[in-house]
């Protein structure tokens, strides 16, 4: 078993995490705010002698700026086209709102959620008419330029749906090694057709769970991905309960056991469980023991 760990850029426990026997790399979530340049943070994280995977957001829809519903506009990271009215989902699919109209990169909401919508939040619109304009964001391109200067090559790309998505990354970073994050039905279709031809796959369950629309279908989706690429990475909601309590809930244990049973041996721990030293180390220790039991 090997595990990629999401790293808070300024955590003081990264050396300890890097030395854990099952850690195979660091993931930098590029929505995290920085107090230094992109080049400087990449240089600093590289000093821990672990590969650094830079997670580019690509066509993933995210909120730009803050908005206070109801009856407000939400500015997105990309212009879109979609038939309206249409549902949009926030908070990993737990909050559904009605979009009355779309104007380029603006959603005009007809109702909630009745809270502040903050910058960086992901937005899911699950509709066959959805078209997202553009792929790489300006931040993505800035990171790729810094990686090229530093000779770094490892990239994760969100919402991959075609070979063109990977080709765009390689146009900025020709020798890049890309992990393809599969998060939509179109992405699943691409994975079934091409497997690992364009790079290893990642079952990014956070958005994938919302995008398959009917919750139970996510189980079949993660099976599809590991069948398409026996070395695929599984990510999102791995042992998240450890972020709130010292002992994981039974469902989390069963989840990891299921993933091991269907063939996953590469895991990625997400932001939630990696924010604190105790929780990330407990998650790593537990995965190590469960991995041994699965051998």
Regions found by a protein language model. Give the residues of each.
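Non-catalytic helical/linker scaffolds that mediate oligomerization, partner binding
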Residues: 1-295
């Amino acid at each position: 078993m090997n595990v990629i760990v999401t790293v808070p850029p300024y955590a003081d426990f990264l050396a300890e995490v890097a030395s854990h026997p099952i850690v195979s790399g660091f993931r930098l979530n590029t929505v995290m705010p920085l107090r230094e340049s992109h080049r400087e943070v990449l240089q600093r994280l590289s000093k821990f002698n672990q590969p650094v995977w830079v997670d580019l957001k690509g066509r993933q829809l995210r909120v730009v700026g803050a908005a206070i519903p109801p009856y407000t506009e939400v500015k997105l990271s990309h212009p879109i086209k979609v038939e309206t009215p249409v549902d949009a989902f926030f908070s990993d699919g737990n909050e559904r709102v009605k979009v009355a109209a779309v104007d380029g990169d603006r959603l005009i909401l007809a109702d909630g959620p009745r809270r502040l919508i903050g910058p960086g939040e992901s937005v899911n619109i699950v509709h066959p008419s959805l078209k997202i304009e553009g792929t790489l964001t300006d931040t993505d391109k800035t990171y790729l330029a810094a990686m090229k200067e530093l000779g770094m090559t490892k990239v994760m790309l969100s919402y991959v749906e075609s070979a063109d998505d990977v080709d765009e990354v390689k146009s900025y970073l020709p020798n890049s090694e890309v992990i393809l994050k599969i998060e939509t039905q179109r992405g699943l279709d691409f994975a079934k057709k091409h497997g690992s031809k364009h790079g290893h796959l990642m079952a990014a369950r956070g958005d994938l769970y919302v995008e398959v629309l009917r919750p139970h279908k996510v189980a079949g989706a993660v099976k599809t991905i590991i069948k398409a690429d026996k070395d695929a990475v599984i990510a999102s909601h791995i042992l998240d309960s450890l972020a709130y309590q010292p002992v994981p809930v039974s469902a989390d244990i069963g989840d990891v056991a299921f993933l091991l049973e269907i063939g996953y041996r590469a895991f990625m721990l997400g932001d939630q469980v990696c924010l604190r030293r105790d929780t990330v180390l407990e998650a790593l220790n537990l995965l190590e023991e469960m991995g041994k039991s699965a051998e």
